[in-house]
A protein has these predicted regions:
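C-terminal alpha-helix plus adjacent terminal tail
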Residues: 53-59, 74, 78, 82-135
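Crotonase-fold acyl-CoA enzyme core
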Residues: 1-93
């Protein structure tokens, strides 16, 4: 689960199960599991998932914000790829990098710093858009 939490999006099959079983071994989730989970779901769900160590299904995971999409495909990897292509197909790599960076900054930095960086990104991109429309 910790690896999935580090991703920008999580796509699951209908029969996927999610859990933090570490507590059954006397451990807490590692590798940023708690921190990243707190960024996605309500803190009450975090307590439940970690202390109970119960498995949750993909539908419940989607309802609490842990999973973004549930795929019914026989080929979930390609369906996930197709979803990402559909989201980004007509966007420049620079735009995608800036969107991801701005979202991460909004989550991790103090608001003043995040807004400053976001405004700088916007201005850089706006100049490029203006220049490209004048060519």
């Amino acid at each position: 689960l910790e690896i999935a939490l580090a991703c920008h999006m999580r796509i699951a099959s209908p029969n996927a199960l999610f859990a933090f079983p570490e507590v059954n071994l006397g451990l807490i989730p590692g590798l940023g599991g708690i921190y990243r989970l707190m960024q996605l779901v309500d803190h009450r769900e975090v307590y439940n998932m970690i202390l109970a160590a119960d498995m949750i299904n993909s539908e419940y995971a989607k309802n609490i914000g842990l999973v973004d999409f549930i795929t019914n495909s026989k080929d979930p990897i390609n369906e996930a790829y197709d979803k990402l292509v559909a989201l980004t197909h007509d966007r420049s790599p620079e735009l995608i990098r800036n969107v991801v960076s701005a979202i991460n900054n909004a989550r991790k930095l103090d608001p003043i710093e995040a807004l400053k960086i976001e405004t700088e990104m916007f201005c850089r991109l706006a100049i490029k858009v203006k220049d490209s429309t004048q060519e």
